[in-house]
Amino acid sequence: VSIANVSHAHFINEEDVYEMIDLNKNQIVGSEIININIADIEKKIEADSTVLSSEVYFTVDDVLHINVVERTPIVRIVAKDKTFYVDANGCSIPISRSGSARVIVASGEYTAENKKVLTEVRQLVDNIRNDEVLLPMIEQIYVTPNHNFILVSKVGPARIEFGDMDNCERKFQYLKTFYRADKVREMWHMYKSVSLKYKNQIVCTKI
């Protein structure tokens, strides 16, 4: 059994795979090829929410290979009623005791059933993780009671008031301009928050 894991979170192991297919290693070893249903094994493995894809095949020397690709989480959802990961396709991945992924955390005042908020969170995360300036800076998203967003920065002003999703791309452009400005970097310690909520401007609040 081979398990490919891009995020290094290790949600599943070899024994988990055998549990998915309702077999143990001893049942497979020594079995006749004709008695092993490859398509059925793949179907059972891919039914697991942690699995993106699988490939099951026999080599010429009659050795069964099971290759599994895990889903890659991009954000950890910490809703009021539930905690789980979400991948780039919007699929939920349960929290595992086997390992945790180092991804952006989205917490706050929302429930796991609020699809609109989850979609907007994923849109924010996609913008952050695909940008070389933003990715090393933003570590958390907080959802306010009125479902606006606050970004938590690792460096500089910790609180970034993003507001709603209107003009999302433009707000991120302003934020990147802010991060890149040399004069701003020299004065980071003087500010506690940055607001992008107002049209065509950045408003900074001093400590």
Regions found by a protein language model. Give the residues of each.
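Short, well-structured beta-strand/strand-turn elements
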Residues: 47-62, 133
